């Protein structure tokens, strides 16, 4: 398999340029953070190349956390790195997420794909605070090759779920709303319709949660 490493940097720059143009045009006061998703290609030399472009990371399995620990040992990343934990949370994955927190990685955010994941997370959570995000379920296009709308919490359930299960917990802090469409970022009425729903949900959720400050836009470029 051949991998053209300069292409990685080109795509990172492309994303940053597009967001920076939009930020300037709309006078947006927030910031944009690029997170390289390790499941796209978890080869060591590929992630090394991505890190040269000052990226943060997104994991999808416990094996990815092993890689993060190796990169830290080699002083290629530090504990201020933003690490988003996505994907199905096996027991081993959850244990390693907690390990990173306990080692002092201060910007890790665990995305909950379902209400059940919170039940399993709480069994290993301990007393230290953990930053979390919630994945919003979407109304998937019927022709989608990979039906992923089973993942996430229905928009009309998220605020109730936060108020009932998260808000009063001293060891949980909601930081992020995660939005992902399997077809990726593309200019279509369907995509922008779902995106608008997510933004409206973020606004309503922010009114209930002061610590919410991040919107995770998942999906690659077409």
Where are these regions (language model features)?
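Active-site-proximal beta-alpha core segment in soluble small-molecule metabolic enzymes
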Residues: 33-214
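Low-complexity, highly charged intrinsically disordered N-terminal segments
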Residues: 1-29, 37
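Flexible glycine/acidic-rich beta-alpha junction loops that bind and position SAM and/or redox cofactors
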Residues: 213-222
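Generic, ordered loop/turn and secondary-structure boundary motif
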Residues: 1-3, 152, 222
């Amino acid at each position: 398999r051949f991998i053209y490493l300069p292409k990685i940097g080109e795509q990172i720059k492309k994303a940053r340029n597009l967001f920076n143009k939009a930020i300037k045009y709309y006078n947006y006061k927030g910031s944009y953070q690029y997170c390289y998703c390790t499941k796209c290609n978890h080869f060591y030399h590929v992630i090394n190349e991505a890190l040269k472009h000052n990226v943060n990371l997104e994991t999808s399995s416990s094996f990815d956390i092993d890689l993060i620990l190796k990169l830290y040992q080699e002083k290629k990343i530090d504990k201020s790195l933003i690490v988003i934990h996505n994907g199905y949370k096996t027991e081993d994955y959850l244990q390693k997420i907690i390990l990173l927190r306990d080692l002092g990685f201060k910007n890790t955010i665990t995305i909950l794909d379902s209400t059940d994941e919170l039940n399993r997370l709480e069994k290993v959570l301990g007393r230290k605070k953990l930053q979390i995000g919630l994945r919003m379920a979407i109304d998937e296009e019927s022709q989608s090759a990979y039906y992923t709308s089973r993942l996430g919490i229905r928009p009309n359930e998220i605020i109730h779920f936060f108020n009932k299960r998260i808000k009063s917990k001293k060891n949980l802090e909601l930081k992020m709303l995660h939005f992902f469409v399997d077809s990726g970022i593309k200019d279509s009425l369907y995509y922008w319709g779902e995106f608008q729903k997510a933004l409206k949900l973020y606004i309503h959720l922010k009114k209930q949660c002061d610590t919410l400050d991040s919107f995770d836009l998942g999906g690659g470029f077409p």
